[in-house]
Amino acid sequence: MKEIITKYPHLLHGGDYNPEQWIDCPKVLEEDIRLMKEAHVNCVSLGIFSWAKLEPEEGEFHFGWLRRIIDHLFENGIYTILATPTGAMPHWMTAKYEEVRQMGPDGVRNLPGRRHNFCYTSPVMRKKMKKINHELSRHLGNHPGVILWHISNEYGGNGS
């Protein structure tokens, strides 16, 4: 049987990791990696809910923080399963483009602030998702520590 993952042909052991929550606390990141190594973690899923941190303002992309984390994980023998960050939209998007928010059966759009609150049929939403995913792949897709891509989180988890 041909190996699907040629970079690491062993059982992957890890889970979701959301370090953007404590990006300004390097000691927490160091301790996390220490604990991961102690637990024999060899991969983590990164970026699932990081859109607001990756694109804090429309068209303004910040990938350096994520690259540094992927670098540090890789230096410690931990691969990254890089997620498309579309599980949660940034606030600027829901505030500027009402049509990107999901609409309930009553015809009323959901309020901002929910995960998976996007409207699949919104051309704006599709364009913005395509852009963030393209930029993410352009900046980090060839990183040696990226072993797999995690495409969308909990597809259909928004009640659609």
Predicted regions and their residues:
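Flexible, glycine- and charge-enriched loops at secondary-structure boundaries
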Residues: 22, 59, 63, 122-126
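Active-site beta-loop-alpha junctions enriched in small/polar residues
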Residues: 18-20, 49, 85-89, 151-156
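Polysaccharide-binding and catalytic clefts of secreted carbohydrate-active enzymes
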Residues: 106-160
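Aromatic-lined substrate-binding rim segments of carbohydrate-active enzymes
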Residues: 2, 29-110, 134-137, 141
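Boundary/entry segment of secreted carbohydrate-active catalytic domains
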Residues: 4-25
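Hydrophobic faces of well-ordered beta-strands that scaffold small-molecule active sites
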Residues: 11-16, 42-46, 80-83, 147-151
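Short, contiguous strand/loop micro-motifs
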Residues: 18-20, 55-57, 120
